[in-house]
A protein has these predicted regions:
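Glycine-rich beta-strand-centered segment in the early N-terminal region that forms part
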Residues: 22-36, 51-100, 141-143
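Mid-domain Rossmann-like dinucleotide-binding core that forms the NAD(H)/NADP(H) cofactor-binding site
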Residues: 144-223, 228
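Glycine-rich cofactor phosphate-binding loops and adjacent beta1-alpha1 units
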Residues: 165, 208, 213-287
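C-terminal hydrophobic helical "lid"/dimerization subdomain
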Residues: 3, 248, 252-256, 295, ...
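NAD(P)H dinucleotide-binding glycine-rich loop of Rossmann-like/cofactor-binding domains
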Residues: 55, 66, 96-176
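Residues at the starts of beta-strands that form the adenosine-phosphate
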Residues: 4, 172, 195-196, 263, ...
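Residues in the short beta-alpha loop(s) of Rossmann-like NAD(P)-binding domains
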Residues: 203, 270, 294
Length: 346
């Protein structure tokens, strides 16, 4: 049993390293990773868009990656619910269990959160073997593949976003952004019985994937007046809008488009300043909600896939071998217009 991993040592540079097999504590399981999804935040880290992450990479080397699934090969002495040979999905965020947020069940807002592949630990999933607390891994049934298991993490974001929004059966929605998170919001809306979902993006390949997954209509914002087009399609201003692109222009458009008493849910991470004009919504009694990761959702996500309610495989259009990690990240960063969702296969 040998462990190898890829360590980020600077902007756009991975270094392959031989690593020790992680220690398995009494409440941990040792997982042989089989698939890892390449998240948009991973690409930002790779590109040097996060100053603190780049500084840590250059100083000590860091390991990113948080969307993963694999097979348990060893268990700690206190572990009873997971056994060797079980395939599992890994919930990336671990709350402290002690702060006020954790005590309310809002552990995604924990004041001392440990998130896989993120500061302060930077111990991510880009390695063949990973030790992890057993309380935060979930057994996959036979009809959920390990590939799908790795995508439980982003699906959980979409499910959490729709839960927070309050959208439900018979409603209609607009989603800005058809990347992985936008598509999981789409899938979550459809699973809740939302009647009409319009998806907006600038990349045709992503829009076509949204159409395959069940979007009522797709709009290329570079080719049309989105506001007029949406109102024409839905027959009215939308009550629910999800901003899943992390794009300031899209966020501003949400304010202009939303209907009276509507709900705007901000799912994407806005990394750049946005000139939101609140005058656009001041007379509409609009509710703006924000989403940070997810909580208490993994079992629901796994069941939705197992029962055929949600299809995750369609969004994956690029699979790279783990040994191609450097190339995989370079291509995922450069080919955003073509790559909808990329994964590493170990």
């Amino acid at each position: 049993m040998k462990n190898t991993g890829y360590v980020l040592t600077g902007v756009a540079n991975f270094e392959k390293r031989e690593l020790p097999i992680p220690e398995v504590l009494e409440d941990d399981v040792l997982i042989q990773i089989e698939y890892m999804g390449i998240c948009g935040s991973d690409i930002h880290a790779f590109n040097g868009d996060f100053g603190d992450v780049t500084a840590a990479a250059e100083e000590q080397g860091i390991m990113i990656g948080h969307e993963c699934a694999g097979t348990v090969v060893k268990t700690g002495k206190n572990v009873t619910k997971i056994k060797e040979g079980d395939r599992v999905a890994v919930e990336a965020g671990i709350g402290c269990g002690k702060c006020d947020m954790c005590k309310q069940g809002l552990y995604n807002l924990c004041r001392d959160m440990r998130f896989l592949g993120c500061p302060p630990d930077y111990k991510g999933a880009m390695q063949r073997y990973m030790s992890y607390p057993s309380a935060w891994v979930f057994k996959l049934p036979d009809d959920v593949s390990s590939l799908e298991g790795a995508l439980i993490e982003p699906l959980s974001v979409g499910l959490h976003a729709t839960n927070i929004s309050g959208i439900g059966l018979g409603d209609s929605a607009v989603i800005f952004g058809a990347g992985c998170i936008g598509l999981t919001v789409l899938l979550s809306c459809l699973a809740k019985g939302v009647s009409d979902v319009v998806v907006v993006d600038v990349f045709e390949s992503r829009l076509q994937t949204a159409k395959k997954l069940g979007a009522s209509a797709v709009l290329n914002s570079s080719e049309c007046d989105v506001i007029k087009k949406v109102i024409h399609i839905l027959g009215e201003e939308p009550k629910y809008i999800f901003e899943a692109a992390g794009n300031p222009v899209a966020a501003e458009m949400c304010m202009k488009l939303i209907g009276r008493a509507g709900v705007i849910t901000l799912v994407g991470a806005l990394l750049k300043p946005s000139s939101i004009i609140f005058e656009d919504i001041s007379e509409k009694e609009v509710t703006i909600k924000t989403v940070f990761r997810y909580r208490n959702i993994y079992p629901t996500a796994i069941n939705a896939i197992a029962e055929g309610i949600i299809d995750l495989k369609t969004m994956v259009n690029k699979v790279f071998d783990f040994e191609e990690a450097q190339h995989a990240f370079e291509e995922a960063a450069a080919q955003k217009q073509e790559i909808v969702k990329a994964v590493l296969k170990f």
